[in-house]
Amino acid sequence: FVSLYGKAIQQNTRVANEQGLLATVRYLPQKKLELSGYLDVFRFPCPTFNSRFDNAKGIEGMLQSLAQIGAGWQLMARYQIRSKQQTYNYKSQVLKEYVMRHKIRLSSLFKATRGDVAVQLDAAYTAKQRGTSSKGIMASCRGSYKASKRVTAKAFMGIFFTDDTDSQLYV
C-alpha cells in the first residue's frame, strides 16, 4: 500500500521479515513551525543479515522540528535513536548484543526565485553492548541556480569523517 498524498514521517525504510508497531505524530503549534516524530517497536521472527538468531528485537525513534524563518528560509533539527539486537562472533561462539545508534542533523535551506542553497551538518554515535563505540561527522552544502528556462546549474560539496561503517552518514 502506498499513499499517493500521504506525508511519510519515517524515511528510507524497507519492511522485510519484520513484525512491529509504528506510531507517528505531526504537530503544528504555529503557522511556521512543524514538530514531528515516530516510535517504531519491532522484532524479526526469522534470522536477518545482522542477526543470525530468531526474534531479534529493536526500537527506533525520531524527533524533528522544522521552522520557516522569513521569506524562503527554513531551519530543521532532527534527532534519531535506534537500538537493535545483532550477532557477533566471540572465539567460537555466536553471541547477541544490542547496538544503539544516535544521529543528529541540523540543516538550513534558503530558496529564492532563481535558485536555492542548503547547508547541513550531521553527526552519528554508535555504542555496542560489549563496550565498543564509533562516531562520525559530516558537513555538506548543495545549491542550484536557474539561469533560464532550459539551463540550471547544480553543485554539491561534502566532507565526512567516520571511525567505521557503524557510524556511517548519508546526505
Question: Locations of the language-model features?
Answer:
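Exposed, low-structure sequence patches enriched in small/polar residues
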Residues: 1-171
